[in-house]
């Protein structure tokens, strides 16, 4: 069966490519700057925005984006305080987001929402709106890193040296935290909260085994991430198809 004839599969392929580009770019900064734990905190904090959106009757993705960006700024601000440890600030927003998400989800009017769609995602259900969101984000990240690759590399490896070069480190760090939050939210419907952090770290860690160049890690991460998504799509199809046929046979018998 030719899978490429189906619109949902075409969307899945294009979404995989766009998500790999966005995650490959910002994920390289995350791994180099050692922000993996912070990114995990923002990922789980986004659940609070999802619950708030379900409760208020607005788009969960929109509310998750706002909540995630504010959480990212909050973590960045608290981590700069001398009386607050960075890991403690992350834990605050991590637990707060999950708690609010669960509470608002079950308080939302009507039927209980299906949270598995946001926790685990479903790459075959992404639509044109999701693709536009991923495409715009990938374009913004590409342009931002193309224009400011040098100060970003300086900040990723040595913030004090970056300050000595008159680079506005704080502004860049807040902007990059915003991009991290938006990338996480853009990938929620595709891979979910549980696996979003994987696209932001595993391809980059794998690429780092072969090169130490920041730019090369970005390119390799995009390729590795896209191949991983393709592998998951083409491997899962025959497994799902076999399971479906077995279920149909059992039902017939």
Please provide the spans of the model-predicted regions.
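Hydrophobic alpha-helical transmembrane segments
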Residues: 13-17, 61-66, 91-92, 131-136, ...
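Transmembrane helix-bundle core of multi-pass membrane transporters
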Residues: 6-11, 82, 90-147
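Alpha-helical transmembrane segments in multi-pass membrane proteins
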Residues: 15, 19-23, 49, 53, ...
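Conserved small/polar residues in nucleotide/adenosyl-binding loops
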Residues: 242-250
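Helix-loop-helix "hairpin" substructures at the membrane interface of multi-pass membrane proteins
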Residues: 19, 130-202
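Short loop segments and helix-boundary regions at transmembrane helix junctions
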Residues: 28-111, 207-219, 235-240
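Membrane-interfacial amphipathic/re-entrant helices at transmembrane-helix boundaries
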Residues: 1-21
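Transmembrane alpha-helical segments in multi-pass inner-membrane proteins
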Residues: 190, 194-241
